């Protein structure tokens, strides 16, 4: 076995199937997951945790120690992968300007443990602690606290028998959720190691790897197919779950259930546009009014009219923006690109075409989301201009080679279509 993995959240059924097949031992399953796979709940400590990102369930976080990175890239071939350059629970020292590396540090402690990696550009610290997968130990008021997942009174009393002697010596102990699944002897030895590490300031090897994966629509559809092999699952299950949790559960009680009504309900008169960059950061583009839509069991197509105001020039096209200019753009669940046609607000003449290459767009309530693949194409006065290919190569550190190759393949396909006057 490669390691023990705990999986939580809306992707749990599909990911349990996938990581089991990759020779990981699945532990601490929910009763529902255990029953779906006709297994007993495996009450053992986890080395790695995979779960929904609490701020956006379109992303997952993976944390712990083990050789899972390559498998993550292979499982999520068409998604963005961010690995924290600073380990979770590692001990760092901030400089005088309250930064560490290129990241801002809050609060500005001289030394502390990382309790939030810098996925948003900021490291959050707490006072220095010795940390293992079972517990945290540090000098303080001599109290014991528990993970929110340790809520059984008997279990808390069991753990207190070990931490109380340390409390009397002035150590704080926080029990992590894994502690429930370890023996008293394992926990006693672990606390002894943590005290030694804390007193000797031996934090060099402390910390857990942290990954944030922004899931694409193609990878969500793959998870749909995996889940479908285990339990009734409609197409777009994992996408729809982001907006309609209970409604999807209700729909799937009917084996002939169709996602069409839920897909239609996601489309409002005006749609926002969430354009996600390779490092996982979202840019909100000017949204647009829906002027045409088509939804069926196989997918969806939405055409927007976006009003373009302000000064400056059209990116890639190079023509000046004038009052009343507008963009007509189609988002199609089957296509890895969107064609923006920019028109003059004065005489409705075509100013130019800009093609954004991305993963196929997904729908959330009133919003279109896709992963931007950096490389784009502009058509200016019959000239074909390939934009930002160097950015694709630079940002490939966040992508599986399959996604990089797909972006280049789509760009070449579009160039051929333009040259043959077959651009639709």
UniProtKB/Swiss-Prot annotation:
It comes from the Archaea. Keywords: Endonuclease, Hydrolase, Nuclease, RNA-binding, rRNA processing. It holds the Pfam family DUF402. The keyword Lipid metabolism does not apply. InterPro entries: DUF402, FomD-like_sf, Ntdp-like, RNA-bd_FAU-1. Its EC number is 3.1.26.-. GO terms for molecular function: mRNA 3'-UTR AU-rich region binding; RNA endonuclease activity, producing 5'-phosphomonoesters. One of its GO terms (biological process) is rRNA processing. The keyword RNA-binding applies. Belongs to the FAU-1 family. Probable RNase involved in rRNA stability through maturation and/or degradation of precursor rRNAs. Binds to RNA in loop regions with AU-rich sequences. PANTHER family: PTHR39159, UPF0374 PROTEIN YGAC. This is Probable ribonuclease FAU-1. It comes from Saccharolobus islandicus (strain L.S.2.15 / Lassen #1) (Sulfolobus islandicus). The lineage of its organism: Archaea, Thermoproteota, Thermoprotei, Sulfolobales, Sulfolobaceae.
């Amino acid at each position: 076995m490669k390691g023990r993995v705990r999986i939580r959240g809306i992707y749990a059924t599909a990911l349990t199937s996938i990581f089991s097949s990759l020779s990981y031992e699945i532990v601490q399953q929910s009763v529902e997951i255990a029953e779906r796979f006709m297994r007993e709940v495996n009450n053992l400590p986890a080395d790695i945790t995979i779960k929904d990102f609490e701020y956006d369930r379109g992303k997952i976080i993976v944390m712990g120690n083990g050789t899972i990175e390559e498998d993550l890239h292979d499982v999520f071939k068409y998604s963005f992968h961010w690995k924290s350059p600073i380990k979770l629970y590692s001990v760092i020292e901030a400089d005088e300007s309250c930064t560490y590396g290129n990241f801002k540090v809050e609060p500005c402690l001289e030394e502390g443990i990382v309790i939030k990696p810098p996925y948003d550009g900021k490291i959050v610290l707490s006072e220095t602690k010795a940390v293992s997968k079972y517990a945290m130990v540090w000098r303080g008021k001599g109290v014991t606290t528990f993970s929110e997942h340790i809520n059984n009174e008997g279990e808390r009393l069991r753990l207190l028998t070990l931490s109380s002697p340390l409390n009397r010596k002035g150590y704080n102990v926080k029990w992590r959720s894994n502690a429930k699944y370890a023996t008293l002897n394992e926990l006693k030895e672990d606390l002894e190691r943590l005290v030694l590490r804390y007193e000797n300031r031996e934090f060099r090897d402390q910390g857990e790897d942290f990954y944030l994966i922004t899931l694409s629509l193609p990878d969500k559809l793959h998870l749909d197919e995996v889940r479908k092999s285990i339990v009734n699952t409609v197409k777009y299950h994992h996408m729809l779950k982001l907006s309609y949790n209970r409604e999807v559960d209700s729909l799937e009680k009917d084996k002939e259930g169709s996602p069409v009504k839920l897909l239609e309900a996601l489309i409002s008169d005006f749609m926002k546009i969430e354009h996600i960059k390779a490092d996982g950061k979202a840019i909100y583009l000017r949204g647009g009014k829906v002027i045409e839509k088509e939804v069926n069991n196989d997918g969806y197509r939405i055409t927007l009219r976006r009003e373009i105001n302000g000064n400056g020039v059209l990116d890639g096209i190079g023509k000046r923006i004038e009052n009343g200019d507008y963009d007509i753009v189609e988002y199609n669940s089957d296509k890895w690109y969107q064609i923006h046609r920019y028109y003059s607000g004065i005489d409705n003449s075509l100013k130019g075409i800009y093609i954004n290459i991305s993963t196929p767009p997904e729908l959330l309530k009133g919003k279109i989301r896709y992963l931007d693949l950096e490389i784009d194409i502009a058509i200016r006065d019959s000239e074909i201009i390939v934009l930002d290919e160097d950015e694709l190569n630079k940002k490939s550190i966040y992508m599986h080679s399959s996604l990089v190759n797909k972006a280049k393949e789509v760009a070449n396909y579009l160039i051929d279509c333009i040259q043959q006057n077959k651009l639709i």
